[in-house]
Curated annotation (Swiss-Prot):
The keyword DNA-binding does not apply. This is SsrA-binding protein. GO terms for cellular component: cytosol. One of its GO terms (biological process) is trans-translation. The gene is smpB.
Amino acid sequence: MAVDPNVKTLVENRRARFEYEILETYEAGIQLTGTEVKSIRAGKANLQDAFALFRDGEAWLHNLHVAPHGTASKVFNHDPTRRRKLLLHRREIDRLRGLVEQKGLTVVPLRLVLNRGWIKAHLGVARGKKLHDKRQAIKERETRREIQRELKGR
């Protein structure tokens, strides 16, 4: 996959790939206020516990923590953990809702990116990993590191 020079990663959910097995990815816009945009551009957001839910034919992002902007007054600042609307096409919402309801999967944000001036969320359709799957992933990562160390040492 080629790297797009117009896309800059602002915040990444590094824990998601460890906690979940990512099956599919989607890109969605997010409905934000001005102070939220300023905070996210500054990297002051946390995707750790965030997830998407579907209600009334709309997709909503819950538990995305966006820190209040420092220079804005309390009156004009936003609620840090409010739910935010995800902007997806109808067929994408229907497909994601079907996957979540039928197969017991979940939708988690993987990262927030700045794409040509717009903040987008990369969403992953995910299945939770069991403890032994996580241990297996750690073992594989360690063996890859050791092999790379050996090759580098030669």
